[in-house]
Amino acid sequence: MLSSLSPYMANPRNTLSQVLNFGLVLSSAFMVWKALSVITNSASPVVVVLSGSMEPAFQRGDLLFLWNRSPRVDVGEIVVYNVQGKDIPIVHRVMRVFPDVPTTGAKDVEGVEASQKLLTKGDNNLSDDTELYAPGQEFLDRKTDLMGSVRGYVPAIGYVTIMLSEHPWLKSVLLGFMGLMVMLQRE
């Protein structure tokens, strides 16, 4: 088995170049992700629909593009939010917008900054999302809970992410395959 690696050990400069190329690809992907985060003002500018709660608008596995620079959210808009204490983004439609409620600690020119409050519901669900919110939470806060509003989507391409989440061993296989391809690449 080690004899098959001998051509790569004979030329360490070429091997180092291939490893650096692999690192360059990974760091470039990271920089693109961070640039998208800054442009969209969202920590996660691209998310995958994980359930069927928004059918027929979005199917499980659809890839959504978010925008979080709008100062307000309107009724009927599809938003992505995180529930406090959980790390799974939820994609649902805004059903009701409550009057702006002053937040504590944050002040603007007039003295108190208001934060929009929202009630959401999945298109394919029978009831609103109050059961999904954190205990004691009756609505979402626009500034703290929302990741962004959906501005576009690509159908079904997110199934790769779902497969990697549901079958963790696939991550190892995929990373190993990518590393092997970089190492076996001839220039």
From Swiss-Prot:
Spans within the Lumenal topological domain = 40-187
- Report the main location listed first in the record: endoplasmic reticulum
Kindly give the CDD domains that the UniProt entry links to this protein: S26_SPase_I
Q: What sections of the protein cross the membrane?
A: 19-39
Q: Name one GO biological process term.
A: signal peptide processing
- Membrane topology reported for the UniProt record: Single-pass type II membrane protein
GO cellular component terms listed in the entry, alphabetical order: signal peptidase complex
Known catalytic reactions: Cleavage of hydrophobic, N-terminal signal or leader sequences from secreted and periplasmic proteins
Signal peptide range:
none
EC number(s) from the headed UniProt entry? 3.4.21.89
State the residue spans of region: C-terminal short (CTS) helix: 173-184
Which parts of the chain does the record assign to the membrane side Cytoplasmic? 1-18
InterPro entries assigned = LexA/Signal_pep-like_sf, Pept_S26A_signal_pept_1_Ser-AS, Peptidase_S26, Peptidase_S26B
MF (Gene Ontology): serine-type endopeptidase activity
Top enzyme category: hydrolase
Entry's PROSITE patterns? SPASE_I_1 (PS00501)
- PANTHER family named in the record: SIGNAL PEPTIDASE COMPLEX CATALYTIC SUBUNIT SEC11
Q: How does it assemble?
A: Component of the signal peptidase complex (SPC) composed of a catalytic subunit SEC11 and three accessory subunits SPC1, SPC2 and SPC3. The complex induces a local thinning of the ER membrane which is used to measure the length of the signal peptide (SP) h-region of protein substrates. This ensures the selectivity of the complex towards h-regions shorter than 18-20 amino acids. SPC associates with the translocon complex.
- UniProt family annotation: Belongs to the peptidase S26B family.
**What does the domain comment read?**
The C-terminal short (CTS) helix is essential for catalytic activity. It may be accommodated as a transmembrane helix in the thinned membrane environment of the complex, similarly to the signal peptide in the complex substrates.
Q: What does this protein do?
A: Catalytic component of the signal peptidase complex (SPC) which catalyzes the cleavage of N-terminal signal sequences from nascent proteins as they are translocated into the lumen of the endoplasmic reticulum. Specifically cleaves N-terminal signal peptides that contain a hydrophobic alpha-helix (h-region) shorter than 18-20 amino acids.
* Protein name (database record): Signal peptidase complex catalytic subunit SEC11
Q: Per the UniProt entry, what species is this protein from, by scientific name?
A: Ajellomyces capsulatus (strain NAm1 / WU24) (Darling's disease fungus)
